[in-house]
């Protein structure tokens, strides 16, 4: 039986909003035959990524009876939090960026980040990516995180830096918040080193899950319900609201409607998704597979850059790294257009 609980995540996003952060989760739909996304933003106080995707599809007439459930067998445990406490107490060492093109701008709670780029693979390309990951015995998450990190490294002052990512973990099936679209999301951190392979990244993610780091972070958020609002704001402002500093968040909403049973016109096309960006987490990378087409979306916090060419270059590099990996395994490389961006 899933444990009953209340949402411990929403109050943190309310505190972030009070600090001027935009807390909308970015979703997008590119209608068939169109090249311009219809952007939709849902507050992270109300839904998480999976919940938001389900909510949007349901509102457009799709039947989504049951949301994805956690697959990893580790059980919730307070001991995992005790074991992780030293990690919370370590000093934070954010990476330094090389100068990026374009201006920076203060974040406001009312304006979405203007610097965003995206790409949607067609069905054969998406199938190739799944096939290569299956052959290598790795997840699509591990594959994409490794190549995203390599794509961004040239923009860091020290290209050999260890790059930490926050990777959300869906805890539905072991936690019940009453409403299935609510914030059923914890996270693990994965630190990607320049010399590591996709298999190394895959192993590191699963070792973190095996240690129960997602349950440690979930328990930490549960205990944080007793913190005063001003303390939450202070911790966010100091970058201490997570177990360590992260370059950004990488979130995969998984595979939706692979049998293409959803036929409502309002749901058709390619779907996009990116998690929010915060001052303590400057990049938001998201992917989702809808009706066998994988999409990539990358947005940048405005205090890093408001120039959409910045994430567009990173997405272009990301696709290139994916293509190189596919070409090393498959006889025919993936052909791809330039990534889309929003000015």
What are these regions (language model features)?
Residues 54-57, 130, 149, 202, ...:
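Non-transmembrane alpha-helical segments in soluble domains
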Residues 77, 122-125, 139, 197, ...:
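Helix N-cap and loop-to-helix transition residues
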Residues 72-74, 114-120, 136, 193-196, ...:
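Short, exposed beta-strand "edge-strand" segments with a Pro/Gly-rich flavor and a Y/T-containing core
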Residues 1-23, 54-128, 317-343:
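Non-catalytic, low-complexity flexible loops and terminal extensions
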Residues 24-39, 108-172:
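Gly/Ser/Thr-rich phosphate-binding loops and adjoining beta-strand/alpha-helix segments
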Residues 51, 73-76, 80, 139, ...:
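Amphipathic alpha-helical recognition patches that constitute DNA-binding helices
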Residues 1-36, 40-50, 66, 154-343:
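Acyl-thioester-dependent acyl-group transfer interface
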Residues 46, 101-106, 118, 128-129, ...:
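Bulky hydrophobic/aromatic packing residues
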């Amino acid at each position: 039986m899933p444990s009953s609980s209340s949402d411990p995540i929403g109050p943190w996003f309310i505190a972030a909003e009070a600090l001027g952060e935009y807390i909308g989760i970015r979703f997008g739909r590119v209608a068939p035959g169109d090249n311009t996304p219809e952007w939709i933003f849902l507050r992270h106080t109300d839904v998480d990524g999976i919940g938001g995707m389900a909510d949007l599809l349901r509102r457009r007439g799709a039947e989504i009876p049951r949301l994805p459930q956690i697959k990893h067998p580790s059980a919730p445990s307070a001991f995992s939090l005790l074991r992780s406490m030293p990690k919370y107490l370590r000093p934070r060492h954010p990476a330094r960026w090389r100068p990026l093109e374009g201006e920076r701008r203060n974040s406001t709670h009312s304006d979405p980040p203007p610097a965003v780029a995206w790409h949607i693979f067609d069905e054969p390309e998406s199938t190739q990516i799944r096939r290569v990951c299956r052959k290598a015995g790795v997840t699509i998450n591990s594959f994409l995180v490794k190549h995203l990190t390599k794509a961004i490294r040239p923009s860091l002052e020290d290209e050999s830096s260890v790059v930490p990512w926050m990777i959300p973990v869906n805890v539905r099936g072991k936690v019940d918040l009453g409403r299935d679209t609510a914030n059923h999301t914890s996270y693990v951190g994965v630190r990607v080193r320049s010399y590591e392979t996709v298999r190394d990244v895959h192993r590191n993610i699963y070792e973190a899950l095996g240690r129960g780091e997602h349950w440690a972070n979930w328990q930490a958020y549960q205990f944080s319900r007793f913190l005063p609002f001003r303390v939450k704001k202070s911790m966010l402002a100091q970058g201490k609201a997570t177990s360590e500093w992260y370059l950004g968040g990488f979130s995969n909403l998984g595979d939706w409607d692979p049998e293409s049973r959803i036929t409502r016109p309002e749901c058709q096309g390619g779907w996009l998704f990116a998690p929010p960006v915060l001052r303590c987490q400057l990049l938001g990378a998201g992917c989702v597979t809808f009706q066998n087409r994988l999409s990539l979306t990358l947005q940048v916090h405005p205090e890093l850059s408001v120039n959409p060419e910045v994430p567009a270059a990173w997405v272009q590099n990301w696709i290139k790294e994916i293509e190189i990996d596919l070409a090393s395994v498959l006889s025919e490389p993936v052909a791809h257009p330039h990534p889309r961006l929003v000015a």
